Amino acid sequence: MAKKIHNIEGVQLGTASSHTRYGDKEDSLIITLPKTAQVSCKFTSNKLKAAPVQLAINNLSSYSSGAKAFLINAGNANAATGQQGMKNVKSYCKAIASELNLKEENVIPFSTGVIGEALPVNNYLSAFQEANTKLSPKNWAKAANAILTTDTRPKIISKKITIGKQTFSITGFAKGSGMIRPDFATLLSFVFIDAKINRRSLNKMHAEALDCSFNAITVDGDTSPNDSSALVANGNEAKLVETNSKAEKKIAQCVKGIFKELAELLIEDAEGATKKIKISVNKANNLQQAKSVAFTVAESPLVKTAMFGSDANWGRILSAIGRDRTIDTIENVQIKVNDVPLVKKGNIDPKYSEAKASRAMKKKEILIQIILNTGKTEFEVLTSDLSEDYVLINSDYRS
């Protein structure tokens, strides 16, 4: 949780409980945006797109005045729920739009939770109506808590940057512990900027931030049907950011930093995780190869269980590299763990020390360095280990 949370002018948040899956815990969030806001949204690549994702995409592509409110519920994904699922999400969006004096297309829904269960629409509608009466510019911590499912703690980052004579606030929060392989996981992310930025620049900023953050993490290799990320600029006229200006570049860097920190918080709170693992691929032939190898190693159950058991089983890492579809030969591959040499030229490194390797593997943060020696490109992926707790959490998730 951020030590100090900076409010974003014109953005208000309200939370309430639907009294469904999580009892009295607040699980419903409404966020209202100023009329001047610009919004960039990115959604799951999963072909099974949840009803709220489908409606969000449709609403954002309409020729209305743009997104002016977000409705987010936790506990029910409203995915694989057919026509009734779409009717349900449309019904509460329409009702809340009326209360906010907005067009239906101005309301953008997001959901996270169990797939394939009918949405208790009346419960969530009542929760959103209650949340609407509790709107406040200060409810950031409550908002970050309301969207959680299997997460054990909220993830929120807030920063201020000064550029020239102006100070810009940027605040964001996210959720996600399992079904994390963005391409975005059961992952929801909302980041807000106190500035006026045009939509094209905002979209570019968003895409670049995703590439080095949520699109560079994995817990279990599964991509949710509900993945959604929103980047909002509130349209503050006093803080106009010109395209390609120094201010835009600095804000973009800060946004990237916030996205990366949120992604790291997701990995630290991954389901059942005891370790945070960075897979760094260097000297790859191209970005495709670097990404492919990094994710192949990061998503290997054998590698992940070895990390959990603090087992310096370098053969599992080398084997994962060897099966990657972009690799022609492993003859030049080098592998290190926390700078301890494991593999050189595709075989055990002559400098290998079992004692040093074992000590390295016992650390809570592990860096696996893979040098392919096929080119000059590099890429990093963050992941977690695979423990018994992950299995327990996911074996009775619906209960």
Please give the residue ranges for each predicted region.
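A structural signal for small-residue-enriched, beta-sheet-centric alpha/beta enzyme cores
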Residues: M1-N73, A77-K90, K94-S399
